[in-house]
Curated annotation (Swiss-Prot):
Keywords from the named record: Ribonucleoprotein, Ribosomal protein
PANTHER family named in the record: 39S RIBOSOMAL PROTEIN L12, LARGE RIBOSOMAL SUBUNIT PROTEIN BL12M
One term under GO cellular component: cytosolic large ribosomal subunit
Lineage, highest ranks first: Bacteria, Pseudomonadati, Pseudomonadota, Gammaproteobacteria, Pseudomonadales
Gene from which this protein is expressed: rplL
Protein name from the UniProt record: Large ribosomal subunit protein bL12
Domain of life: Bacteria
Biased composition (Basic and acidic residues): 101-116
A GO molecular-function descriptor: structural constituent of ribosome
Chain ranges passing through the membrane: none
Native species: Marinobacter nauticus (strain ATCC 700491 / DSM 11845 / VT8) (Marinobacter aquaeolei)
Family from the record: Belongs to the bacterial ribosomal protein bL12 family.
Summary of the function given for this chain in its UniProt record: Forms part of the ribosomal stalk which helps the ribosome interact with GTP-bound translation factors. Is thus essential for accurate translation.
Keyword flag Ribosomal protein: yes
InterPro entries assigned to the protein according to its UniProt record, in alphabetical order: Ribosomal_bL12, Ribosomal_bL12_C, Ribosomal_bL12_C/ClpS-like, Ribosomal_bL12_oligo, Ribosomal_bL12_oligo_N_sf
Pfam families registered for this protein in UniProt: Ribosomal_L12, Ribosomal_L12_N
Length: 124
């Protein structure tokens, strides 16, 4: 029985961030393609449209863990719901996106929580 696009999208929606990253890497390897080109082109197109209106969605990007790495890992786990291993990998792999498409208030709150834990954070 073949899976429909909706079935696949629902399965992906239930995955953790790390599982989605692993899926993308496996797809790149299997089909001998790179998702990097598509990702690089998308922000350029989006930036042109955003110039006319105020930005409503933000990405919270962890740029560094700072001195208190354990506290940063705890904050990442709290914000994302990731397991200890996945949160540690995200912190160790900085810069990494902690939240995507967050509202301005949600992004500011996440940034504050991460900075209080000792991380350096950017909103994009």
């Amino acid at each position: 029985m073949a899976l429909s696009k909706d079935d696949i999208l629902n399965a992906i929606a239930e995955m953790s961030v790390m599982e989605v990253v692993e899926l993308v890497e496996a797809m790149e390897e299997k089909f001998n393609v790179s998702a990097a080109a598509a990702v690089a082109a998308a922000p350029a197109a989006a930036a042109a449209g955003e110039a006319a209106e105020e930005k409503t969605e933000f990405d919270v990007v962890l740029t560094g863990a700072g001195e208190k790495k354990v506290n940063v890992i705890k904050a990442v786990r709290e914000l994302t719901g990731l397991g200890l291993k996945e949160a540690k990998e995200m912190v160790d792999g900085a810069p990494s996106t902690v939240k995507e498409g967050a509202s301005k208030d949600e992004a500011e709150e996440a940034k504050k929580k991460l900075e209080e834990a000792g991380a350096s954070v950017e909103l994009k």
